[in-house]
Amino acid sequence: MKTTLNKIRVHSPCANGWEKLLKNLGKTRADDEPLALTTILESNGLDDALWCLRAVDGHEREMRLYAVECARSVQHLMTDKRSLDAIDVAERFANGKATQQELNAAWGAAWGAARAAAGGAARAAAGDAQANLFILMCEGAL
């Protein structure tokens, strides 16, 4: 999965992350050379690589399935059925087996569950698993 520095720049990246990426690429300004998201991951880390997904054309299905896999990697921590149901609906939607209306309803219910169970421990535990899944998504292995 690839983007370009010009596509990233259009979305106004944070100054620190932008300068770090340019430096690690040995560049001083944006260009249209294809840039692998895994290169951004190696340079700047998972948060910046995920942020750069907004600068990728297409691949909506892969991105949604990545989110599903990230959620599944920590679903053992989920105790609210609304969250588990939302994962299933998101996967079905990515595969063309659920409607936008079903997805919206599941999303709303899941946010209600998330607000009820908000906590940083689950997010921290998921970080490494998400980075590994991100690489698989970028390589087309999901």
Model-identified regions with their sequence ranges:
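Short, glycine-biased loop/turn motifs at secondary-structure junctions and
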Residues: 1-142
